[in-house]
Amino acid sequence: MRWGCHLPRTSWGSGLGRTVPLPDELRIQSSWPFKGVHHPLRPPRAFIRHHGNSADSAPPPGRHGQLFRSISATEAIQRHRRNLTEWFSRLPREERQFGPTFALDTVHVDPVIRESTPDDLLRPSTELATGHQRTQAELPPLALSQLFDPDACGRRVQTVVLYGTVGTGKSTLVRKMVLDWCYGRLPAFELLIPFSCEDLSSLGSTPASLCQLVTQRYTPLKEVLPLMNAAGSRLLFVLHGLERLNLDFRLAGTGLCSDPEEPGAPAAIMVNLLRKYMLPEASILVTTRPSAIGRIPSKYVGRYGEICGFSDTNLQKLYFQLRLNQPDCGYGAGGTGVSVTPAQRDNLIQMLSRNLEGHHQIAAACFLPSYCWLVCATLHFLHAPTSAGQTLTSIYTSFLRLNFNGETLDSTDPSNLSLMSYAARTMGKLAYEGVSSRKTYFSEEDVRGCLEAGIKTEEEFQLLQIFRRDALRFFLAPCVEPGHLGTFVFTVPAMQEYLAALYIVLGLRKTALQRVGKEVFEFVGRVGEDVSLVLGIVAKLLPLRILPLLFNLLKVVPRVFGRMVSKSREAVAQAMVLEMFREEDYYNDDVLDQMGASILGVEGPRRHPDEPPEDEVFELFPMFMSGLLSAHNRAVLAQLGCPIKNLDALENAQAIKKKLGKMGRQVLPPSELLDHLFFHYEFQNQRFSAEVLGSLRQLNLAGVRMTPLKCTVVASVLGSGRHPLDEVNLASCQLDPAGLHTLMPVLLRARKLGLQLNNLGPEACRDLRDLLLHDQCQITTLRLSNNPLTAAGVGVLMDGLAGNTSVTHLSLLHTDLGDEGLELLAAQLDRNKQLQELNVAYNGAGDTVALALAKAARKHPSLELLHLYFNELSSEGRQVLRDLGGSGEGGARVVASLTEGTAVSEYWSVILSEVQRNLNSWDPVRVQRHLKLLLRDLEDSRGATLNPWRKAQLLRVESEVKTLLEQLGGSGH
């Protein structure tokens, strides 16, 4: 997978909020939880705003005209509205992650709907070519309120068919339309009755009248059923998902029936409704996939509308603004307080908007509203994880569930093949071939080769045509990047890696030898027992030496095939592990940063100059493969018709563990180590992780930006381990107190803990105090240098040190302690009895407090070394400290300068290496001043000694100091 300047292509699944926007008019339907408060967003063009809220207001009383004026009818309609509101307001778990106030009628952006004609429907499918753009150029757009307007000839429109490919938002559009009616926003209809064609098809041929179908689903409407005939066009039936229902409009197949109380097959009832033979004045809205449009003869349809998604970038931006600006979006799981601030949300939206403007490929992806949902869910996952156990793989699996759950490729086909299963076999093959050959751009021949592979019958060809019309655009998009025009790419890069992993774990990848071996194995399995029995009898009767050999061969065949399959699994595991630990990319970020960069438009990992420009990196492929083996994702995939057998999952996991055990023992760069941990996080199997990571002794994540998600990943994978970690290095990780709190189970296992350069303030010291006081704490070395702890923080920290029995080395270098902090340390140092080394250098302390701390250190029972260099010490103060440290009374040695009398301090290299390491982060003017003072000490000591060996040592150290000064001077200081 390459994460770089091109971005994933993004849109969202089976339904996300949308508005009916036109190129010259945008319509926003929004209602907020607080009455009278309008959302501040303003699209660049005029729009109409509607108000209402399902969260805290009951549906308004309907305007029933002359039809439903009776009290009983009015109450029945009101109960019906309330029931529909409750039912259609329920959101799947995947939507609830965006905050408790998120609701479909709170913020909604309708997709573009464009009117089409029967002639357009008869044109050959252009598959992935720019068919949508052609439609947009030729046909006018429609608003929801215009669907039943008279046609161009002035004729009344009674039946409207809306069609769109998978992911364009048909389901959400229907839900939003029903909720609009419930809140009085569709005054043209006094009664709305929605039907799910999936529900109707489940009834089979069981006879039921239209009245029974209505009352079984909407009990309150019993009161108004007698009035349906008189309702006319003010009665609206909504038939959602026509592709699920087999309709036969032939008179020989479905007889005429005009009585709503006459029982019949549900499909026959719908046919007579659509024929306008039953309730001829009623209005009907039908939604369907493109392949099923022809099931209704065009003479029964007054208007066709194509749902075209978010063809305008402004709609995409508006969707992201409304979705990501939810007030309750971004709070951590379990009340941990981790949240995305309004400023951070605004920054995300601005970066995403700039990316949409600058990179046409992500805009092409966001053409489908479902992929807009995926982008929002991914950003939410990366920046504000909300639920324990949520993984990147589960987001993609849920995304497919939202779009494909229960979807069959063709309801008329007896095989009842699931649409997702067909996609896994065809698109998964293309995706895996791309990963294997390291490419993301595919020619038309590549696509056709994977789609048409193995097709032999007319039925298989028909299924392929349905898939092309209904779902191909969901997975593939024309590439609009310069230099790759005429090729196709997966809608988002990560989808290629997900499908490739799915193709593997489903066992769809088989070599020719495996296919032949499987057939032989199945044949032997069918006849093996009988043949073995016959051979056994014959061998006893006739002295034929060949028969025992044949008998043994029959036993060997299953074992040979099993080994062949096992070798194939090991080969895949080997390729996956090698992909995960590739280091070819220069400045390779971890996969989470790569994914965020690709969505937000931040430049991704730079390539090494000698690397071929076409080389692709697919580091998410192993992550998805691991995630798909988790129990949760396997359960969801089974719902989609893609079951992964438990035995297959176990054997795949064993093969992966075998390879990881070998590769995982090597020392990895920090970003690669985080990828390794993320692999285990995706798997969600603590036993597997404990066995593979049992040999891990050093956790070096220095320089990795530890977001809340990454802290959760590390804590989840390593928090339950039992063996100690020799060193945990979290230097320069942008850690905050919340991150420290999350990582507490891991920090308790550390012996050496490095938290340098993390901008940790006094509030972080409370977590550090709790860490030090924990009865399982085994930290011996704690490095907190270059953090603004201040005197307030060190006071809290001393409370932890007072009760701690493990820490022997503590570094508080450059922690803004000042005189107050060192004075506090001097007063409370005796509360700890185990400390052996204390570094409080570069803290702005003066002579008095430095001397007081040095005296306290000399009295400490265990302290051996105290670092005080680079403080605001005078020449006299440094001399007093040198004299104190050089006295023969025992106690801690005090290091305040590069010299000890007329000799070089044995700690001179420690001091200068610390300066060199922090040269870019410390104040250059202040460092330069301190180095000049140290240089003066060296020169004075050199002038005061006659020992040539000491002079040579002093000259060498002077040279090192001058080199550092030149580096600072070369930087303009």
From Swiss-Prot:
One Pfam family from the record: NLRX1_C
LRR repeat locations: 693-716, 722-745, 747-775, 776-799, 809-832, 833-855, 856-875, 876-897
Task of the protein: Participates in antiviral signaling. Acts as a negative regulator of MAVS-mediated antiviral responses, through the inhibition of the virus-induced RLH (RIG-like helicase)-MAVS interaction. Instead, promotes autophagy by interacting with TUFM and subsequently recruiting the autophagy-related proteins ATG5 and ATG12. Also regulates MAVS-dependent NLRP3 inflammasome activation to attenuate apoptosis. Has no inhibitory function on NF-kappa-B signaling pathway, but enhances NF-kappa-B and JUN N-terminal kinase dependent signaling through the production of reactive oxygen species.
Coiled-coil region(s): none
Main location: mitochondrion
Domain LRRNT as annotated: residue spans: 665-692
Region (Required for interaction with MAVS), start-end ranges: 73-554
Binding-site list for ATP: 164-171
GO molecular function: ATP binding
Domain-level remarks: The LRRCT domain mediates homodimerization and LRRNT mediates trimerization of the dimers.
LRRCT domain mapped to chain residues: 904-968
Matching InterPro entries: Leu-rich_rpt, LRR_dom_sf, NACHT_NTPase, NLR, NLRX1_C, P-loop_NTPase
Species whose genome carries this gene: Rattus norvegicus (Rat)
All copies of domain NACHT, residue ranges: 158-481
Transit peptide: 1-84
Keyword Glycoprotein attached: no
Localization in the cell: Mitochondrion outer membrane
Family: Belongs to the NLRP family.
Keywords tagged on the record: ATP-binding, Host-virus interaction, Immunity, Innate immunity, Leucine-rich repeat, Membrane, Mitochondrion, Mitochondrion outer membrane, Nucleotide-binding, Repeat, Transit peptide
Region (Required for the repression of MAVS-induced interferon signaling): 554-972
GO biological process: innate immune response; negative regulation of canonical NF-kappaB signal transduction; negative regulation of inflammatory response; negative regulation of innate immune response; negative regulation of interferon-beta production; negative regulation of interleukin-6 production; negative regulation of macrophage cytokine production; negative regulation of RIG-I signaling pathway
Subunit architecture: Homohexamer. Interacts with MAVS. Interacts with TUFM.
Protein name: NLR family member X1
GO cellular component term of the entry, any: plasma membrane
